[in-house]
Amino acid sequence: MVVPFPGSPRPTLGVEWEIALVDRVTRDLSNTAAEVFDAVANLAGPEDPRITKELLRNTVELVTGIHSTVGEAMDDLDESLDLLRRAANPLGVDLICAGTHPFAQWSTQLVTRTPDYDELIERTQWWGRQMLIWGVHVHVGVSSPQKVFPILNALLQRYPHLLALSASSPMWAGVNTGYASNRALMFQQLPTAGLPYQFANWGQYEDFISDQMKTGVITKIGGMHWDIRPAPRWGTIEVRVFDGISTRAELSSLVALVHCLIVDLDRRFEAGENLPNLQPWHVKENKWRAARYGLDAEIILDEDSNERLVTDDLNDLLEKLAPTAVRLGCADELAAVAEIPRRGASYQRQRQVAEATGGDLVAVVDALVKELGT
């Protein structure tokens, strides 16, 4: 089948930021999304397209419009977050963003009733109900379908950098899992999620989508929820690697990193360069290492199986991308990526709070609420 990809003449930028609702007193998740949406409508009018529903009724997603720069996208998110806060505050609801909630139980969460979500839960059953997770998705415009998989495949080489920097889900249902990102390994249990296939060209992807629809695996083109995927409707590559990002500063820096990575790979493709394409088994291992060890992961760099500490490789990567960041107007945001290892990633900060308070996970949520305000 033909999968249209209209393309974007410019490397446009869009961001989706999933926000969890927590009770101000108990710090448990709050299944009050319906009430929050009513409050948003009272403040700003019905159906604000930037504030949307998600699978669970403890979650609200902030969605930007189409932008040219990181600064524009962040201004958009700032407006939506401010509106969401004003709606949630009178309800006794605070906001956090992390890959998982430290102690909430999946069995007490309510599902948003829509045909798509009903179908998901009916098909995936226990695993689908376990999806008590939050992430950030970044879209970058690409001009033609012929570029999509060379860029996507090369981007997988940087998968562990993106996951390690954003990792924010060390705890699950009150347990310290030992993983920096438990979310990454939870989400891949769904049949349409996980790492993408490394297709050689757009035609192979079209054949794959045809097979999936013919056999009932998906019912629409957007039904594959890979960690990095084409978004044909928008003419973008969508990066879905990130755990929920806990602070505005980290969000802006990591959005800049994705924008620069894709634009740099696009430039190199246009120049006739053969982009890197790491073996699938190395990509899979790198995902696991980043999920397990976070910023302490030793990652596989290339087809020759050379290895390096992810933070050491990150320093070189930021230097290489600096000229691209200048052209895109996000030099300061990209440079701020280096602050994450210095300060400690969210998973490290959460563990530190838990250790300092004798394992008080309510205190961890308190810290996450405070961080989202910075």
From Swiss-Prot:
<dbReference type="GO" id="GO:0004357">
    <property type="term" value="F:glutamate-cysteine ligase activity"/>
</dbReference>
<keyword id="KW-0436">Ligase</keyword>
<dbReference type="InterPro" id="IPR006336">
    <property type="entry name" value="GCS2"/>
</dbReference>
<dbReference type="InterPro" id="IPR014746">
    <property type="entry name" value="Gln_synth/guanido_kin_cat_dom"/>
</dbReference>
<dbReference type="InterPro" id="IPR050141">
    <property type="entry name" value="GCL_type2/YbdK_subfam"/>
</dbReference>
<dbReference type="Pfam" id="PF04107">
    <property type="entry name" value="GCS2"/>
</dbReference>
<keyword id="KW-0067">ATP-binding</keyword>
<dbReference type="InterPro" id="IPR011793">
    <property type="entry name" value="YbdK"/>
</dbReference>
<protein>
    <recommendedName>
        <fullName>Putative glutamate--cysteine ligase 2-2</fullName>
        <ecNumber>6.3.2.2</ecNumber>
    </recommendedName>
</protein>
<keyword id="KW-0547">Nucleotide-binding</keyword>
<comment type="similarity">
    <text>Belongs to the glutamate--cysteine ligase type 2 family. YbdK subfamily.</text>
</comment>
<dbReference type="GO" id="GO:0042398">
    <property type="term" value="P:modified amino acid biosynthetic process"/>
</dbReference>
<dbReference type="GO" id="GO:0005524">
    <property type="term" value="F:ATP binding"/>
</dbReference>
<comment type="function">
    <text>ATP-dependent carboxylate-amine ligase which exhibits weak glutamate--cysteine ligase activity.</text>
</comment>
